């Protein structure tokens, strides 16, 4: 937990509510017990939502550890909202259990929590790299979750904004978990299906709460659906043949040993050239990029991660991942020995994937490299032992017209819309 200036807890019992009565208290997270409450919030919010995929608790907790590289150039403060069990009616069985949370085997985990039920959470953060890049005192909020009571959301937003204002920020942007390289975006359309791997999901009432609290749209992003249960357009294969004839070679990403490290260095160089000017993006060092790549190494499937080379230099890639949310949903946020067995068993059911990025250097696009990569990436999914039925291409900013044109011309259709919000700090 990141320390913050001493402050009293905030109460929101006098705020107007369209939902319930009861006292809401905002607490700055500073203890291990409060961190546990912070981590429990999603399980309460999404208890009755069939589309929610529980994140690994360990992966969330790790982001607040004292050795997080983010702390070298940023700072943050976690907040939780707590209240009595009447405020979680309709979200979980907590109210029926008289405010006691239980483990999977029904044993009481924490007693006498009638006034300490976690109702929501938020993290306010200051990313100095973002401030330096944009030349403005822009703070961030992220990790936001809350039950369907507007008072809870309002109190959490107030706490985050007050903390950011005390840090000298004049504007807030989010949801962004420390940076856009991490989890970000709020789902505003497309609530009828689960999220793909490493994509956000939230209740449909979040956008309404944001707007009621005075937040406005900063930018939208889209997720495209691309069906694979039909023949691919002939243009894809033709583009692949043209690229090969022009001297471009293609291969799967190396995923082992020194070859993996070397490929990741090439990927970093391409990312830096192609995406460094993306809106709200912040620079990453090579070591930060390699650390993230190593954490994902065991998840990479070379069948859906083709790279393009010209005269020995990597000039493009298609970054695909199997939709690991399918087995992760069965793990329920716990990767213990039983969770690992469940993950490996249900991994065999994966029949779809997500395309995180398509990249080719501009000077090689006339060699049909982008379409050739699409062809190889899609065919890699189609030829799996359990053929992929579809792919999601996400996320693409609304004003990234070159990428949108390429995806839409290839048959992709927008099926989910996400949003980043902003608010001025008066």
Language-model features: locations:
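Acyltransferase donor/substrate-recognition loop-hinge adjacent to the catalytic core
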Residues: 6, 21-22, 200-280
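Glycine-rich, histidine-containing beta strand-loop boundary motifs that form or position
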Residues: 122-126, 143, 173-178, 219-221
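Alpha-helical subdomain
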Residues: 126-129, 329-330, 358, 405-408, ...
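A conserved beta-strand-loop-helix scaffold within acyl/acetyltransferase catalytic domains
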Residues: 42-79, 83, 124-132, 255-259, ...
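TRNA-binding/sensing appendages of the translation machinery
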Residues: 22-61, 161
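Acyl-donor binding region in acyl/amide transferases
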Residues: 131-214, 331-410
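Short, basic, low-complexity termini and linkers enriched in Ser/Thr/Gly/Pro
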Residues: 2-19, 84-117
């Amino acid at each position: 937990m990141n320390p913050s200036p001493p402050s009293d807890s905030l109460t929101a019992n006098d705020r107007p509510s369209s939902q319930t009565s009861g006292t809401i208290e905002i607490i700055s997270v500073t203890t291990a017990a409060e961190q546990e409450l912070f981590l429990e919030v999603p399980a309460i919010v999404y208890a009755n939502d069939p589309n929610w995929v529980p994140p690994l608790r360990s992966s969330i907790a790790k982001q607040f550890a004292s050795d997080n590289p983010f702390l070298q150039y940023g700072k943050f403060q976690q907040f939780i909202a707590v209240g009595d069990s009447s405020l979680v009616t309709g979200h979980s069985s907590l109210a029926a259990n008289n405010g006691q949370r239980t483990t999977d085997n029904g044993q009481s985990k924490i007693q006498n929590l009638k006034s300490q039920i976690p109702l929501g959470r938020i993290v306010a953060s200051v990313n100095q790299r973002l401030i330096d890049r944009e030349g403005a005192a822009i703070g961030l909020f992220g990790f936001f979750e809350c039950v369907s009571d507007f008072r809870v959301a309002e109190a959490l937003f107030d706490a985050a904004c007050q903390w950011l204002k005390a840090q000298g920020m004049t504007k807030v942007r989010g949801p962004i978990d420390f940076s856009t390289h991490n989890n970000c975006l709020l789902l505003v359309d497309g609530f009828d299906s689960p999220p793909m791997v490493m994509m956000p999901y939230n209740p449909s009432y979040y956008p309404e709460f944001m707007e009621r609290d005075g937040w406005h749209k900063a930018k939208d992003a889209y997720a495209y659906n691309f069906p694979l249960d039909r023949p691919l357009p002939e243009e894809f294969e033709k583009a692949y043949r043209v690229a090969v004839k022009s001297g471009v070679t293609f291969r799967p990403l190396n995923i082992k040993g020194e070859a993996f490290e070397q490929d990741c260095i090439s990927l970093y160089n391409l990312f830096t050239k192609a995406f460094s000017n993306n809106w709200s993006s912040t620079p990453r060092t090579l070591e930060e990029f390699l650390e993230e790549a190593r954490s994902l190494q065991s998840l990479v499937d070379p069948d859906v991660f083709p790279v393009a080379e010209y005269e020995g230099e990597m000039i493009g890639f298609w970054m695909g991942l199997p939709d690991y949310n399918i087995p992760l949903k069965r793990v329920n946020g716990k990767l213990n020995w039983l969770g690992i067995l469940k993950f490996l068993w249900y991994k065999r059911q994966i029949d779809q994937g997500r395309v995180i990025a398509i990249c080719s250097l501009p000077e090689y696009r006339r060699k049909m490299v982008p379409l050739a990569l699409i062809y190889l990436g899609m065919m890699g999914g189609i030829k799996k032992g359990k053929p992929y039925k579809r792919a999601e291409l996400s996320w693409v900013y609304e004003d990234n017209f070159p990428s949108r044109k390429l995806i839409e011309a290839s048959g992709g259709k927008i099926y989910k819309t996400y949003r980043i919000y902003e608010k001025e700090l008066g």
